[in-house]
Amino acid sequence: MAKDPVRVLVTGAAGQIGYALVPMIARGVMLGPDQPVILHMLDIAPAAESLNGVKMELVDAAFPLLKGVVATTDVVEACTGVNIAVMVGGFPRKEGMERKDVMSKNVSIYKSQASALEKHAAANCKVLVVANPANTNALILKEFAPSIPERNISCLTRLDHNRALGQISERLNVQVSDVKNVIIWGNHSSTQYPDVNHATVNTPAGEKPVRQLVSDDAWLNGEFISTVQQRGAAIIKARKLSSALSAASAACDHIRDWVLGTPQGTFVSMGVYSDGSYNVPSGLIYSFPVTCANGEWKIVQGLSIDEFSRKKLDLTAEELTEEKNLAHSCLS
């Protein structure tokens, strides 16, 4: 029995991440090899011609799972009937710009997209915010789309999670698929805390803790953390462009695990609405370890938090509270 197509919105679709992401979605990377999709692509008017070029290429690629493409600069048309929304469009910080200026541009973008999604998206639409500042953009979207359940709004920290997996796999010279349960706590920014205290590696002798195998706490508590925190900047320095293919791949991982479930015994990192778990203030979109089943995420409970970690969790929560206040000041 063929499945009904799922409508997936990508905003900022003519941009770098969008260009990497739409073929992955059309190929079944996000929702599986037997799930047909209809792509909705939104971008701003100056990018309309470029967006049309992407649409032409999607047609030319003849993806068997791709059952239709909507390419538009109209936010209502873009949001109508969508089941999944990946919000890549935002206002990037340019040299010499104050944080408040960037924040106020993004607040107005996410405020208007929130109301379009609320009015026109399918019931139970799942929303993933990728554009920076991702946690705070997601929070604004949540506040201006009150009828979208908070459990359906998330932001991308899977890229940081995957970066952490990659660093451990390189350090230990093991397959990245054998490393699991790293955690990204907090903000998708340089205050995020990549935590390996609960991470394990699948070895011929069974699962072993990452800390035990690395046996270099100075590296794990120092260079490892800063490498993951600063990885985005390192890629911009090397490529002269921000990370796109890794961000697109992480967005697919995030949605796939959310919709289809995480493997037994594995948790992943998602920016979700805090309920006070781990003494993180509620009312923030904060990255937690989660498991997913039946299209719902659940924060993993009962993990021990040492003193070193506690400070890191609090520091990134403070930054998110500041960002939230800054965003609210842009609204008033």
Curated annotation (Swiss-Prot):
GO cellular component terms, semicolon-separated: cytoplasm
GO biological process: malate metabolic process; tricarboxylic acid cycle
Coiled coil: none
Amino acids binding oxaloacetate: R99, N132, R163, H188, S243
EC number(s) reported in the record: 1.1.1.37
InterPro entries (UniProt xref): L-lactate/malate_DH (IPR001557), Lactate/malate_DH_C (IPR022383), Lactate/malate_DH_N (IPR001236), Lactate_DH/Glyco_Ohase_4_C (IPR015955), Malate_DH_AS (IPR001252), Malate_DH_NAD-dep_euk (IPR011274), Malate_DH_type2 (IPR010945), NAD(P)-bd_dom_sf (IPR036291)
Active site (UniProt): H188
Entry's Gene Ontology molecular function annotations: L-malate dehydrogenase (NAD+) activity
Pfam short name (any one): Ldh_1_N
Annotated NAD(+) binding sites: Q16, I17, D43, G90, Q113, N132
Oxidoreductase listed as a keyword: yes
Keyword Oxidoreductase assigned: yes
Lineage: superkingdom: Eukaryota
Database matches in SUPFAM superfamilies: LDH C-terminal domain-like (SSF56327), NAD(P)-binding Rossmann-fold domains (SSF51735)
Keywords: Cytoplasm, NAD, Oxidoreductase, Tricarboxylic acid cycle
Signal peptide: none
Protein localization: Cytoplasm
Reactions this protein catalyses: (S)-malate + NAD(+) = oxaloacetate + NADH + H(+)
Enzyme class, spelled out: oxidoreductase
Quaternary context: Homodimer.
Family stated for the protein in its record: Belongs to the LDH/MDH superfamily. MDH type 2 family.
Protein name: Malate dehydrogenase, cytoplasmic
Organism for this UniProt entry: Medicago sativa
Gene name in the database record: CMDH
